[in-house]
UniProtKB/Swiss-Prot annotation:
KW Transmembrane (keyword) present: no
GO cellular component, one term: cytosol
Binding site for ATP: G65, P66, E67, S68, S69, G70, K71, T72
Annotated family: Belongs to the RecA family.
Lineage: superkingdom: Bacteria
Protein known as: Protein RecA
Lineage: Bacteria, Pseudomonadati, Pseudomonadota, Gammaproteobacteria, Vibrionales
PANTHER family: MITOCHONDRIAL DNA REPAIR PROTEIN RECA HOMOLOG-RELATED, RECA
């Protein structure tokens, strides 16, 4: 670039920063803050599938799946992980179905969690926007998009037609929210339900509610599915769960995480450590016995998991080594690396 152009560019940049504030325009390579801060999801497998060690701050995230697939559990696990890092979280309960007892069992500090149960969709989204603009909230969860009912629909008659009303409301909200979330470095997670498109002969008939705006504005989209039941004898004690990263703007997409959600406990972290440890040769398996560093830790997976629950320092070491192996060095050294929360041994 010639000297006159450089002077003109410097003057323009100076004017823009003077008018709109420092950092309103920058060279991409100069800005260290472009490294995206993340929060662990509570599942090591999912953190690895996301490629960044967790979900990104300052972005919109969409979580969708069938009923009882673990969508709310995933967000509550993330809230618990964020609270352990000293972050402030809010839960916009549009479905009016949040169970504080279950949230507490997953490790959520319910005394510190901000909860809103809005009357209309517009009210819920205005609350989200106000919290984002405050700069004091780190994580927000909206459960769920399907329950964000426009005011006109609530005040109208039961049979009235409101074509595209919710989609227009969400599209406008996304335009307002995106910039405010980035400026305040606040993550907003929207939980979505699945619907079936009528008359689809070929291809996938599934779609999500609320139009297409959220799909475009979301930096990460997660598809969570229940793939089987975990039984102890005849009693079902949890779900086998598959989480697919459908969209990812911070790392490579289309990766999958297979994990277990135990009723009343959340993600089976110790089970993930055993499975991933064996896969990547950190944990040795000989017959039914599992060993780590030459020491036997249990006969059968259940006993190995119990050992890791009782010896949290061993679990933390395996967790840290797996993150160092499977994530980039900068990501693996994050605050969530190696932290294994204590589980409450309660029946759900």
């Amino acid at each position: 670039m010639d000297e006159n152009k450089q002077k003109a560019l410097a003057a323009a940049l100076g004017q823009i920063e003077k008018q709109f504030g420092k950092g309103s325009i920058m060279r991409l390579g100069d800005n260290r803050a472009m490294d995206v801060e993340t929060i662990s999801t509570g599942s090591l497998s999912l953190d690895i599938a996301l490629g960044a060690g967790g979900l990104p701050m300052g972005r919109i995230v969409e979580v969708y799946g069938p009923e009882s697939s673990g969508k709310t559990t995933l967000t509550l696990e993330l809230i618990a992980a964020a609270q352990r890092e000293g972050k402030t979280c809010a839960f916009i309960d549009a479905e009016h179905a949040l169970d504080p007892v279950y949230a507490k069992k997953l490790g959520v500090d319910i005394d510190a969690l901000l909860v809103s149960q809005p009357d209309t969709g517009e009210q819920a989204l205005e609350i989200c926007d106000a919290l984002a603009r405050s700069g004091a909230i780190d994580v927000m969860v909206v459960d769920s998009v399907a329950a964000l009912t426009p005011k006109a629909e609530i005040e109208g008659e039961m049979g009235d037609s409101h074509m595209g009303l919710q989609a227009r409301m969400l599209s406008q909200a996304m335009r307002k929210l995106t910039g405010n979330l980035k400026q305040s470095n606040c993550m907003c997670i929207f939980i979505k339900q699945i619907r079936m498109k009528i008359g689809v002969m070929f291809g996938n008939p599934e779609t999500t509610t609320g139009g297409n705006a959220l799909k475009f504005y979301a930096s990460v989209r997660l598809d969570i599915r229940r793939t089987g039941a975990i039984k102890e004898g005849d009693e079902v004690v949890g779900n086998e769960t598959r989480i697919k990263v459908v969209k990812n703007k911070i790392a490579a997409p289309f990766k999958e995480a297979n994990t277990q959600i135990m009723y009343g406990q959340g993600f089976n972290r110790e089970g993930e450590l055993v499975d991933l440890g064996v896969k990547h040769k950190l944990v040795e398996k000989a017959g039914a016995w599992y060993s780590y560093n030459g020491d036997k830790i249990g006969q059968g997976k259940a006993n190995a998991c119990n050992y890791l629950r009782e010896h949290t320092e061993v679990a933390q070491t395996i967790d840290k080594k797996l993150r160092e192996m499977l994530l980039s060095p900068a990501v693996a050294e994050g605050p969530e690396a190696g932290e294994m929360p204590e589980k409450k041994e309660e029946e759900f």
